[in-house]
Amino acid sequence: MSFEQVVGEKENRLEFLTSTPPMLPRQVVTLAFLSKHLPSALMSAQLAASLCAESSGVSVVLVRLQPSERPPSFLDAYDEGRATAVDWAPSEVMLQGQFGMPSSLIRTETGFHLLTLNVHGETSSPENIASLVAQLRRQFRYVLVEALADETPTPGLLEFLVQSDLAYLFLQGTTEDVYHVDLLIRKLRPRCQKPSGCFKPILCLAEGEQANGFDLLIQRVATPVHMYVRQCPTAAAGKDPGAPGGLTSLFKADLRRLAREISGRLLGLALSSGAAKGFSHIGVIQVLEENGIEVDVVTGASIGAYIGSVWAYGHDGREMERLAREMEGRWRLWSVIDPVFPPRQGFLRGLALKRRLMRSIGTSRFADLQRPLRVVAGNLVTLERTVFASGEVATAVHASIAVPGICVPVTIDGETYIDGGVVDPVPVDILREMGVSRIIAVNAIPTPDRIRYSLQAEQELARAKAGRGDRARRLFRKVVPLEQQLNYFARGNLFEIVMRSVHGAQVRLAEASCGLADVALRPDICDDRWLDCRNPGRFIALGRDVAERHLEEIKALVARKEPNHEREHTPRPMAAVA
């Protein structure tokens, strides 16, 4: 399309062009590929197709930016005989001086539209890019912009990122790519008023490839890795997606998760602290699995982090119950007790519990987990909340379960951490910050009213038993209170006082966090015996019960449709999209 054609129809489109496009959530998303070894065209097309599948009936356009010196085919290595409509899209919109929407767009078999733009060096001004984005906003609910990032980010790429509501920065685990993402974010910060969380690094790992510490490096120099794309094919392998082993189910699932984030369909699960009461999380997970409800992201604090890590690793609810029941019995608790002497920072190291966790998940890192996980801990020095999303999972969970005054604080990379339940007992807001729009929160921390009810019931039961039983045994326990003198875990002793004090600080925080969730599950736990690990089945049953009672509400949340913001397309030839 020529510049003269654009000018010729300018008057006819004046009202259309000057109207303000609706600002919809996550409407314009830039897919910036920082590595030339990634199959950018394949990944963006797969993501666009997944977005169409997740948002049926909603219009999606993939805008493919290519330097003007390239031939029309974006995938250079495709043979002309095997190329599809996606590969040989007409490049009739030129990014120079003025924009004109093409008279027709290619609609792919998977439902999205494809528009290829030739980019002429430095001629793509901010005004022109803003004009294009405004036109696309009017016509499509979702606009995906695919761009290859050079070693030095071009002004055009930076402007597309500034105009975007969200940007995924795809990179590989190399020092060069880490440098590129750091440079890109540093150049964006002065120009963009959006929060830095809008620019999300996506680490792409080939089949069998490990993060090898690059997740930690990215977090230090830029921002934490948002998500991972695993079993990612190379650029060469991506030329033939139909080849055996070309696209794995895990690769598709990871891209589908990104599409669910864009479409506002991500489902998150926030698991609270609560010590032994946290076994109720397992019952909730079992009900979700039995009803085919797929959770995309998990966050947890303290025991919630422990259980969330086991589930994110790949163990299902039944296997988790089996692992929990290994703690049944009067003396099983001592298998995770590792005293410290002298108890200068705490009475327990917490390493025994960490070793028990590693029996289930090994030395896995966050990049190895089947679903994204966020672990919460408190920084003892700065008193701020820390969210672990990279590194070794067991180490992060060890920090999250270090109850202050009982367990020795955990030091990681020179920083000292304590129990995550102290700073964020039900980490719902972390899910919101990640872009999760549908959240289920499980709060296993009993409220004061429930605790009072439990105490009254115990008193009534004690009075009923007062006239019967072994009077000699009761008299002996009263005269020689060995339980109170020797058992530091007994009610009214040191550990109990510390835990109840922590619990008192958590109650209001937990309830406030539940108010941010779409569905809040509160198992009917009345007693406050934080170390009652001898009967995990009881808490699991309570978790199942509350999940089953709210099952219809959960299903309605999963099936909830986002508001339809589609506009009726104008019949004008320059603005209409076929």
Identify what each model region corresponds to.
Residues L51-N118, V133, A324:
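Phosphate-binding loop that captures ATP/GTP phosphates
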Residues C204-E207, A211-L250, G317-R356, S360, ...:
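Non-catalytic peripheral regions of patatin-like phospholipases
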Residues E294-Y313:
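Catalytic nucleophile loop
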